[in-house]
Structures are given as structure tokens and as C-alpha cells.
Amino acid sequence: VFPDLKLSGILEGLCGQFQVEKVTSNKTGSRIKVYIVSKKLVQKEQLFCLEKNIKEQLFPKSNVEIVIVERFELSEAYTPQNLFEVYEESILAEFKADNDLEYNLFRMAEVTFPHENVMNLKLPAAFVPEMVEQKLKEDLYNIFAHRCGLD
């Protein structure tokens, strides 16, 4: 998709793990979204690094924002609990990049799995606006259900 993109090491190998489904741009051209699908988990920090490389190499003088939208087709061996164990740092990295409040709430939350497919999230005792709590739940649901294919 980006023939002029030069990657090395981990990023080069990373690109072999996924397929680009489509590339879109908003009307002003200020944001380009690259939709990828992978049969393996790709850590969010690696995708942030790939976004940065695309921006720096292909759009160095532009204010365009590059966003990689990932989707995983994982094996049925993944449950919410074992996915969380290997993907927690990526969830934290995503929250940190998007919303400091969500990041700090999630970082301080107590996460338990009373059943393999049920996640309980106990937020800190501090006052948390209901809309922030709801957004955190929605974001987690989107990560587990839509991105990773677990319901």
C-alpha cells in the first residue's frame, strides 16, 4: 500500500503479520486511516511507531494525522481473561494517548474475571462522572468485541 515506506527490524516484520483492508481520508485530507486485519495480536505501541514512520517518511511536511485502525481475527483459544493478560499494556497505551482521565482510572482500577468470559472493573473510590465511566466501559467493549472478536 505504501511502496516508498522503508521499515527495518521489528516494524518490517510487523507489516508481514497483517493485511491492509483499506485506506481512507477525511474530506480535508488532514486524517488518513489505515484499516488493518491480523490473525495475531499487534501491540498498540508498535502501531503508534508505524503511524509515526508513515507520517515522517511519506508526509513529512504535512499536518496529516495517520491513524491505524486494527482488527484481529484471533483463535478461539482467546478468552477475555487471557486476552487481557497479554493485551493490557496496549489498552493502557491507547487510553494514555486518547484520554488522561480514562487512562488513570483504568490504571488504578481493580480488574477481575469472576468467570472466564466476564470482566469486572472496580474503579477507584474517587468521584467518577457517570459519562466517563460509561465511555470507559464502551471503549473496553469495543476493544474486546469489535477489535478482537470476543463477545
Q: What is each residue range found by the language model?
A:
Residues 1-151:
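Intrinsically disordered, low-complexity basic tails and flexible linkers associated
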